Amino acid sequence: MTPPRTTTPHPTRRTLLRLAAGTILTAPLSTLLKAQPTPSMHTRPIPSTGEPLPVVGCGTWRTFDVGDDLTAQARLAEVLRILFAAGGSVIDSSPMYGTSEAVTGTLLTQLAAHQKAFVATKVWTQGREAGIAQMEESMRRLQQPRIDLMQIHNLLDWRTQLATLRDWKASGRIRYLGITHYTSGAFDEVEAIMRSEKLDFVQIDYSADDRAAEERILPLAAERGIGVVINQPFGGGSLLAQLHGRPLPGWAAEIGCTSWAQVLLKFVLAHPAVTCVIPGTGRPEYMIDNVHAGIGDYPDQALRKQIVAALSA
């Protein structure tokens, strides 16, 4: 379970977080967020096409695996409303994530939001025919006639699946293709594929306490024109647990941060090779927190060093 977040609120966010806690229930959170005089979320160009992509999205591992639980689905619908109201669009899933794909598809249909979403999912199986069958099932679950980004999950049988993804991209069934891994231990293979193959995206782990991607993967992505999606920006939740209850340093206000979660997300987004970050959440108040990291200034190199130092203080 993700630990509670420590937030230093300003008036707009105080109202929203009180609403999220159930203190005031006069309107949906997403409606109030949309009504605030808040700038739109930053976008960054997808290197292979120049298409602008909002910098903060939503991961669905565990958090969207709620099956037919209507109460949980209603909460997740509010999460997505907040994402869209803030100008976000990226939703990342996988057939590995239980019912997450099906729940995402149901919610996008309920919200009439398929056109607002940039839907990313993955193929995670061995063999060409099995890969095709799995991707077709993902499209059915997501209720998407076309997938924006199809990724090879954890590099599983990547040569076979990449050939299929190229065919699907050429035929218009997917718009972009890529590879993913969740641990820096796989970076040697990730790097080799990035050097040998033409990719639109790579999805990797990167956080203020796990900066291995800075050594080779992020510079190579910039060199090769590959978009970068970041998973586990909170170190799998361990960073939030470590920082829980600790007051924000004064320098956080310099980049408009009112929570440690925003500081950690802005640390990741400050790297110029990063295209988008996809923190997973199933709670509306956390999505409000996350999307604010896509607004305002990012830390410079000196401030990034202070963020890293704060983790070991």
What residue spans do the PLM features occupy?
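N-terminal binding-site loop/beta-alpha segment at the start of enzyme catalytic domains
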Residues: T2-A117
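Structured C-terminal cap/extension of enzyme domains
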Residues: T26, R216-A313
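Short amphipathic alpha-helices and their capping/turn segments at secondary-structure boundaries
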Residues: S40-E51, E136, E215-E223
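Generic structural signal for well-ordered alpha-helices
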Residues: T43, L80, E101, G105, ...
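Conserved, mostly hydrophobic/aromatic
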Residues: I46, C58, I91, T104, ...
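A cross-domain feature marking catalytic cores of carbohydrate-active enzymes
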Residues: G57-T60, S93-P95, T121-V123, Q151-N154, ...
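Glycine/proline-rich, positively charged
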Residues: G67, Q126-A212, R216, E223-V229, ...
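Short hydrophobic/aromatic-enriched beta-strand-loop microsegments
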Residues: K116-F118, L199-I204, D297-L303
